[in-house]
Swiss-Prot record:
NDH-1 shuttles electrons from an unknown electron donor, via FMN and iron-sulfur (Fe-S) centers, to quinones in the respiratory and/or the photosynthetic chain. The immediate electron acceptor for the enzyme in this species is believed to be plastoquinone. Couples the redox reaction to proton translocation, and thus conserves the redox energy in a proton gradient. Cyanobacterial NDH-1 also plays a role in inorganic carbon-concentration. Residues 216-235 are annotated as: Disordered. It is a peripheral membrane protein. This is NAD(P)H-quinone oxidoreductase subunit K. Residues 216-226 have a biased composition (Low complexity). InterPro entries: NADH_UbQ_OxRdtase-like_20kDa (IPR006137), NADH_UQ_OxRdtase_20Kd_su (IPR006138). It comes from Synechococcus elongatus (strain ATCC 33912 / PCC 7942 / FACHB-805) (Anacystis nidulans R2).
Length: 235
């Protein structure tokens, strides 16, 4: 009969000690979680500001709000950014440049529409034919920030919501999570009309210049003689 040391007796119903030791040194996760954690912790924005909304975003750089705690590092090149923040009015002339900046950003990339002028065109879309009535007509927008202009606290809330969206992304299902609808805005309805500036106002008698001596109330000195060669040189 062989006697076993009591210290070597193991309870078969208890969790094994090997697993307990590994659990303290090994992190079990998925590729999506690791990939999303790295991206949401280092969002590098490209700031596209054309109006007063951009000043509110600039307030986040200060110590009061400190947007560096979210891992935001502003970049000057679209090839180094993964977040495009549009703040201000977008015109027809600037639309191709904005789309080009978005196309130069590497995938995956996100867009935040900041302010009423960016979302719907704002007050400029009422009587302007050159204002884009909603940046979502050009780019897929992930987060909207309404306001004129929105407060820095609203921008932080949008960053937090975007981080939650990034955390739920899946590499395999990313194609199914693309934007399917747009923010409700008025479409452009261009109607050709006759030009208002016909030149008749400038040709009116009231706009014609009167005699110079009478207007100035003083005599005008005679003009200096100009030779034929000097006249050709001036022409």
């Amino acid at each position: 009969m062989v006697l076993t040391n009591p210290a070597e007796i193991r309870n078969p119903a208890a969790p094994p000690e090997i697993t307990q030791g590994l659990s303290e040194n090994v992190i079990l996760t998925t590729l999506d979680d690791l990939y999303n954690w790295a991206r949401l912790s280092s969002l590098w924005p490209l700031m596209y500001g054309t109006a007063c909304c951009f000043i509110e975003f600039a307030a986040l750089i200060g110590s009061r709000f400190d947007f560096d705690r979210f891992g935001l590092v502003p970049r000057c090149s679209p090839r180094q950014a993964d977040l495009l923040i549009t703040a201000g009015t977008v015109t027809m002339k600037m639309a191709p440049a904005l789309v080009r900046l978005y196309e130069q950003m590497p995938e995956p990339k996100y867009v935040i529409a900041m302010g009423a002028c960016t979302i719907t065109g704002g007050m400029f879309s009422a009587d302007s034919t050159t204002t884009v009535r909603g940046v979502d007509k050009l780019l897929p927008v992930d987060v909207y920030i309404p306001g004129c202009p929105p407060r820095p606290e609203a921008i932080i809330d949008a960053i937090v919501k975007l981080r939650k969206k990034v955390a739920n992304d899946s590499i395999q299902e990313r194609g199914k999570l693309l934007q399917t609808n747009r923010y409700y805005s008025t479409t452009h309805q261009m109607k050709p009309t006759a030009p208002l500036l016909t030149g008749e106002y400038l040709r009116s008698a009231a706009r014609q210049a009167g005699p110079l001596p009478a207007a100035a109330g003083a005599a005008v000195a005679p003009q200096l003689p100009v030779t034929e060669k000097e006249g050709r040189d001036r022409a």
